[in-house]
Amino acid sequence: MDADALSADVSAAASADVGGPPARVVTSADGTLIGVFTTGQGPPLVLVHGAAADHTTFRVVGPRLAQRYTVHAIDRRGRGDSGDTLPYAIEREFEDVAAVAEAVRDADTSGVPVIGHSYGGRCALGAALLTDAISAVVCYEGAPTPPGVEYGDAALADELTALDEAGRPADLLEAFVRRVVGMDDAGIAAYRADPVWPRRVAAAHTIPRELLAEGRSGAAGLDALARVGQPVLQVLGGDSKPEFGEATAALDDRLANGTIVVIPGARHAAHHTHPDALIEAIDTFLAGA
């Protein structure tokens, strides 16, 4: 998530109704409860958010998608209205998304497209290996890092873990947005003053474990995803960091039924900054999936 992305996330989440309960709670394979927030009418689809966020990050695109879909936005485990079970493994997140898709499929008796942003896209792809309830996947810059491409900063992951273990979640979140997102002092001050800050602090402990899990995935994650048989649309921001493009291309090379769409001018948060272009890509893809 870059600085523009996080700024947009703050604004979107602050304007969202963060006090309402989930429409349903789904039990995952390990017993963890996953909160699902549902709006709209029409064919079902599931939204899966990325790191340092919750379901409110889809405040901009969610209502627009809900004009023609029944939108089921989840809180991933460890935050918001979802539970958590240790030890953490990214595979449990795959199971969470699969469980939600199966619950929605049971209610609507149809296949369910899953749309995931960043780490949420990785979770959506992994879930597609577990269930035929997922009919298609839209992944926004969530492909595993290919061999030879450095993912993040291992020292930073250790530093964030130490802050978590020291019981300093606010400092953890600030370190993440400063060093990974690139937010400056003024941006951090505004973020801390925003109503969404406590929600993000409460979920800050999930950041280092996700950085570590993604960093360890690498080539093994890419090779496993070669078995995904559902149609997969990967969406890439035209102005995103080069490593996102490299990961997207590496995954597309392995997929049997993959497509790439590039949104000109977008970076890592087109769901905030270029919602119309993103929704157009989703609609076009799902019409042919």
Language model region names:
Residues 60-63, 72-115, 119, 280:
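Active-site loop/oxyanion-hole signature of alpha/beta-hydrolase fold enzymes
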Residues 25-83:
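Conserved HGGG/HGGXW glycine-rich cap/lid loop of the alpha/beta-hydrolase fold
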Residues 1-45, 68, 287-289:
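Alpha/beta-hydrolase fold catalytic core
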Residues 168-208:
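Conserved alpha/beta-hydrolase catalytic His-Asp/Glu region
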Residues 199-253, 262:
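Conserved serine/cysteine hydrolase catalytic core
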